[in-house]
Amino acid sequence: MSDAYKQAGVDIEAGYEAVARMKKHVLRTARPEVIGGLGSFGGMFDLSALNMKEPVLVSGTDGVGTKLMLAFQMNKHDTIGVDAVAMCVNDIVVQGAEPLYFLDYIACGKSEPARIEAIVKGIADGCEQAGCALIGGETAEMPGMYDETEYDVAGFAVGAVEKADLVTGADIESGDLILGLPSSGVHSNGFSLVRKILLHDHGYTLDSEIPALGKKLGEELLTPTKIYVKTVLQTLKTGKVKGLSHITGGGFYENVPRMLPEGLGAEIDYGSWPVPPIFSFIRETGQLSAKDMFSTFNMGIGMAVVVSSDDAPHVIRQIQETGEDAYIIGRVTDTSGVVIGGAFE
């Protein structure tokens, strides 16, 4: 390698080592439709092997946001990749698409092979949970752009669905019920507010033992985002799902309307599902309003599902058979917007 390039802060040999270390993680995500191996200029996937009549490709890209800063502080890098995958695949499965493959982008100030491997391990873990192949990626060492202990992670997911099976929300009508699938915690949104309230304003540390949580604060906050792919795909086989929404940035107020036809809204019954204690801890510590909480956080619901009232019992049973819980958390209304009923003030 070029000594001059290394003196400029780019260690190509470290990059080669990182690639070698990540191979075993990439290989465990393989699907039979993947063509070629690690190291090609582009990842290849044989779409014809799916035997679809009218395949529609659905794609999504996302990152992890400032949750990364907690990983830096805790020097724990093996779960943040799950978050990157979850944010992408949960977005495309709500259209009815099965995630097929994933690509990652890691930018760092210094290429540390063990750290890169830990990140990719998490990405591979997420891909396994979603059933998609990790077919490519980029690791960019960018001295001067990032501190040596810092990095950013983004991902790109592509899935496919038969055109006739696209979930568009077009058939949703007033009176339909909204089911909620529980989240694993804060997921990957709202961390700038979390850090401000808990770490900066009130002096908690990531090592603080929080009695209400039964664990250290950092352990709770770094809990990976739940991946709903397998539950959703199995539930879609009922043919009864009218709409789906991934509750991410913007909370209920922004994400629930995204699945509804124009002119319709939703009434959400706060108290109809168990809210994880982390949200009460954030709310009480920061003295936040219901509007603040529901427009920033998932509040314990990571995925919303719309079904008719007649179909709700059958769909709930199907969800439960996948090992997931489901709660009736509200209903569709004939007035646009989201109303949170029974919420704290």
Swiss-Prot record:
- Give, as in the UniProt entry, the pathway in which the protein acts: Purine metabolism; IMP biosynthesis via de novo pathway; 5-amino-1-(5-phospho-D-ribosyl)imidazole from N(2)-formyl-N(1)-(5-phospho-D-ribosyl)glycinamide: step 2/2
What keywords are assigned to this protein?
A: ATP-binding, Cytoplasm, Ligase, Nucleotide-binding, Purine biosynthesis
Enzymatic class: ligase
Q: Which domain of life is it from?
A: Bacteria
Q: Which family does it belong to?
A: Belongs to the AIR synthase family.
**Reaction catalysed by this enzyme:** 2-formamido-N(1)-(5-O-phospho-beta-D-ribosyl)acetamidine + ATP = 5-amino-1-(5-phospho-beta-D-ribosyl)imidazole + ADP + phosphate + H(+)
For this UniProt entry, what's an example GO CC term?
cytosol
Q: Which residues form the signal peptide?
A: none
Q: Under the GO molecular function aspect, what terms does this record hold?
A: ATP binding; phosphoribosylamine-glycine ligase activity; phosphoribosylformylglycinamidine cyclo-ligase activity
List where in the cell it is found: Cytoplasm
Q: Which SUPFAM superfamilies match?
A: PurM C-terminal domain-like, PurM N-terminal domain-like
Q: What is this protein called?
A: Phosphoribosylformylglycinamidine cyclo-ligase
Q: Read off the HAMAP family from this record.
A: AIRS (MF_00741)
Please tell me whether the keyword Cytoplasm is annotated for this protein. Answer: yes
Pfam families noted in UniProt:
AIRS, AIRS_C
Coiled-coil residue windows: none
Which is a GO BP term held by this UniProt record? 'de novo' IMP biosynthetic process
Q: What is its EC number?
A: 6.3.3.1
